[in-house]
């Protein structure tokens, strides 16, 4: 039950916000872009992808011609059957990549989702551990007189604010990953069309690499949450004989430090992946 003490309530509310954001992250990472927010964003992105496909196909021809001009010294090179066949195969593959780009991206997404679910199940918890206020801390706070509790109010206000801000920063990173996935999906045909020409194909390659990096960010975020849950599963050790303010300050300090570690890891997930994949 909720305590009727304002200080305890404030701390418990902040922790509740944190816990709800953590479980929301857990939920978001197992959600596919088609299910996110009822799928309305996804359907718009698919429509945009379809419209951009026309531009992609026009660019495909352009990159193909540029590629032919750049790679063939003269027209006689193009007339060689093996050279012509190579060019034709490249064009056909590039056309296929644009037409079935969405399916390709979803297949990659499914592979990474599988990895994320495997990480979750092998870690052995379906949801991250809840952070709660220790009972002895509640007792200490509730036994304070009016004047003793004035500095406590200040401490909990600062602590509560910190915890709330950290939980929002963390959830924003996860939403940011989703929005990146949508943007990649919508604009995919343009970078994919560069596969038509040999000089321009690096753009397409780096597009696919960056897309995989965005997908794998999810796995890093899950790992960060798992490590945090295990790291913070033992509540901060507080000296029960110390003054109430000191106890609360020590508790909040250690808690916020643990949370900062997690938020830092979540925010750096894209950098970690880029370093891992050498992007």
Which residues are covered by each model-predicted region?
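Hydrophobic alpha-helical transmembrane segments
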Residues: 54-66, 158, 162-164, 181
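Alpha-helical transmembrane segments and their helix-start/interface "positive-inside/aromatic belt" motifs
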Residues: 3-11, 81-101, 204-214, 269
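Binding/recognition "hotspot" determinant
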Residues: 1-59
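Alpha-helical transmembrane segments
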Residues: 192-209, 241, 272-276
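Hydrophobic transmembrane alpha-helix segments characteristic of membrane transport
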Residues: 59-95, 187-201
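Non-cytosolic segments of integral membrane proteins
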Residues: 94-187, 225-278
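Alpha-helical membrane-interface segments at transmembrane helix boundaries
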Residues: 45-53, 85-89, 176, 205-208, ...
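Short amphipathic alpha-helical coupling elements at transmembrane boundaries
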Residues: 24-27, 83-90, 110, 117, ...
């Amino acid at each position: 039950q909720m305590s009727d003490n304002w200080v305890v309530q404030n701390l418990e509310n902040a922790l509740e916000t944190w816990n709800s954001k953590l479980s929301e992250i857990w939920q978001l990472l197992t959600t596919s872009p088609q299910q996110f927010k009822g799928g309305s964003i996804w359907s718009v992105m698919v429509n945009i992808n379809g419209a951009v496909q026309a531009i992609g196909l026009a660019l495909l021809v352009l990159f193909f011609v540029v590629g032919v001009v750049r790679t063939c010294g003269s027209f006689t090179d193009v007339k060689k059957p093996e050279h012509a066949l190579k060019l034709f195969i490249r064009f056909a593959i590039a056309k296929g990549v644009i037409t079935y780009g969405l399916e390709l991206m979803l297949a990659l997404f499914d592979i990474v989702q599988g990895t994320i679910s495997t990480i979750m199940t092998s870690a052995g918890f379906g949801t991250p551990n809840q952070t709660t206020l220790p009972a002895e801390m509640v007792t200490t706070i509730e036994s304070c007189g009016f004047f003793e509790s004035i500095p406590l109010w200040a401490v909990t206000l600062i602590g509560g604010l910190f915890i709330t801000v950290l939980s929002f920063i963390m959830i924003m990173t996860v939403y940011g990953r989703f929005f990146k996935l949508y943007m990649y999906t919508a604009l995919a045909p343009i970078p994919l069309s560069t596969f038509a020409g040999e000089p321009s194909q690096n753009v397409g390659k780096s597009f696919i690499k960056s897309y995989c990096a965005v997908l794998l960010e999810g796995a890093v975020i899950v790992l960060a949450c798992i490590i945090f849950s295990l790291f913070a599963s033992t509540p901060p050790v507080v000296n029960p004989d110390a003054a109430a303010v000191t106890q609360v300050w020590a508790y909040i300090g250690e808690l916020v430090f643990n949370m900062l570690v997690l938020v830092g890891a979540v925010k750096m997930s894209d950098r970690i992946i880029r370093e891992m994949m050498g992007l």
